[in-house]
Amino acid sequence: YFVDWIVLNKHKKQCLPLIDLLIDGQREWDELLMISGNDLREGLHKMSRNFFRVRPWFEPGAWGGQWMKNHIQGLNKEVNNLAWSFELMVLENGLMLESDGYRLEVSFDFLMYSDYQNILGECSETFKYDFPIRFDFLDTFDGDNLSIQCHPRPRYIQEHFNMPFTQDETYYILDCKNSPCVYLGFQDNIVPEEFQYTLERSQQKATKVEIERFVQKHQAKKHDFFLIPNGTIHASGKDCVVLEISSAPYIFTFKMYDWIRMGLDGKPRPLNIQHGMNNLYFERKGEKVIQELICHPYIMKENQECTIEHLPTHKEHFYDVYRYTFKDRIQMNTENTCHVCMIVEGDSVCIETEDGMKQRFNYAETFVIPAAARSYTIINENPDKRIMLVKAFVKKEVTLK
């Protein structure tokens, strides 16, 4: 965890209106790029009224897979695997500004400091400069299971880590093969003390745990949607590509069992068994898991142009998810709410905003439509294939716990 980010971001906010010249220093000395402060602020404001996609980054991992290497252009093919793509984890992402073929990167924070009300709309005073929703990929294709883990309860993350809200997440199965699964919720006969003893003994003795004695294993298929509110035991199995949609407080995950494997550095990855035990809801077990933690989508609207489905999230989630299926085009209104979108089936779309700006977005690319965009059109660029798009947004009248 990088404490300097928090300190320097406060300074960055104060500096934004005073900047005369901003330099992108990620290049050789004779290739540095710069932008005037006025152009920077104008570009950010324009972005806040139309659309944006952050620059994602990709990272290998102990359980990483091969799907992203084979499906996303421009990635390093020499790495053994890719485990994560932080598609929209704004503490890690930058924004690219282009002029005359040159691309300059600035911190995402600048956009929120410049125009957070345009970005977030009706929930802007709830979240202020903290962008609330995160999209990322977990790739276990030809890889391995994720660690068995959970996320902190709201009060716990506030008291122990000084974060404004916690990570309530979901798994959307973008792709899968063979016999994919998701580990989610406890078996009906779970005994917390036995679970803790077994995990701690495994950590001390490096012995395997028969995890299905304690944790349910659910078969998964493409476009399934699993709900993982804070305090829920969970993990993705191998041979999945998971679009993880979650709230975005940063990196507070309590790993409790990691299959007795080594990290990329050849050492066991750190576990946080006691933190996990302090936060788990052991009542999320048995049939309750199927009823409350596996989403049951339903059709909200269906006509010749489009099918709109609601993918209800858990009551703990402050965001909701809709899914749109269409072949030609659809018109959207933001209703003063920020939309975070991804094409989960199809080739590409063209987004055209009320202000007349246009941009192509491809399959599996995350893009954001700010609340201030008001209305926009999504046009399928290959009508021979249908488009399936998921949209996440903050629920009405949200208050943070």
Where in the sequence are the language-model features?
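Transition-metal
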Residues: 2-6, 11, 15-193, 258-297, ...
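Tight coil/turn sites that cap or link beta-strands
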Residues: 153, 229-231, 239, 326-329, ...
